A protein has these predicted regions:
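Class I S-adenosyl-L-methionine
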Residues: 78-121
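S-adenosyl-L-methionine
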Residues: 2-41
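Glycine/threonine-rich flexible loop motifs
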Residues: 42-53
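A short glycine-rich, Lys/Arg-flanked "PGG" loop and its adjoining helix->strand segment in the class I
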Residues: 51-70
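Short catalytic-loop micro-motif centered on adjacent basic/acidic residues
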Residues: 73-77
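Eukaryotic intrinsically disordered and solvent-exposed regulatory patches
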Residues: 1, 61, 100-103
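Short, well-ordered alpha-helix to beta-strand connector turns
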Residues: 12-13, 31, 64, 71, ...
Length: 121
C-alpha cells in the first residue's frame, strides 16, 4: 500500500508512506493487482480537473508498467470524459480486457467511475 497519509497497519500488507510520484524509489517485487482510489483535489472546473486526473493516471500507468505482473489486474478511479478516454487508450495495448464500472454507491450525477484492466499483456 502506498499513501502520502498515515495508514493503520494491516496484516500481510507492506505500507509505504510516500508521495505517489516517488514510488519508483522503493524496492518492490512484482504484484498481481494494482488498486487505486486516488483522485485530484477537485477545483470544480472540468478542464482543470480532467488534466489533473490525467497527470495522476500517467503516474499510475508507469507503476503498472513497472510493478504489475503479466496476467495481473489494475483497478482505478477516473472521471468520465477526457481522462477516461485517455486511460482506455493507454490500457488497450497493456491488457486483454478493459471494463468500465460505476459502483452503486456512486451518485448517478457523479462523473466518477472505475476502469478495470484484466490480464496484463
Amino acid at each position: 500500500a502506498i499513501d502520502i497519509m498515515p495508514m493503520k497497519e494491516i496484516k500481510n500488507v507492506n505500507f509505504f508512506q510516500i508521495d505517489l510520484k516517488d514510488v519508483h524509489k522503493i524496492n518492490l517485487n512484482k504484484v498481481s493487482i494494482v488498486l487505486s482510489d486516488i483522485a485530484p483535489n477537485i477545483s470544480g472546473v472540468s478542464l482543470i480537473d480532467s488534466e489533473n486526473m490525467k497527470s495522476l493516471l500517467e503516474i499510475e500507468i508507469s507503476i503498472v508498467d513497472k510493478f504489475l505482473k503479466i496476467g495481473g489486474k489494475y483497478l482505478c478511479k477516473c472521471f468520465e470524459g477526457d481522462s477516461m478516454i485517455f486511460l482506455k487508450n493507454e490500457l488497450k495495448n497493456r491488457f486483454r480486457k478493459i471494463k468500465r464500472i460505476k459502483p452503486d454507491a456512486s451518485r448517478s450525477t457523479s462523473k466518477e467511475c472505475y476502469i478495470l484492466g484484466i490480464d496484463k499483456i
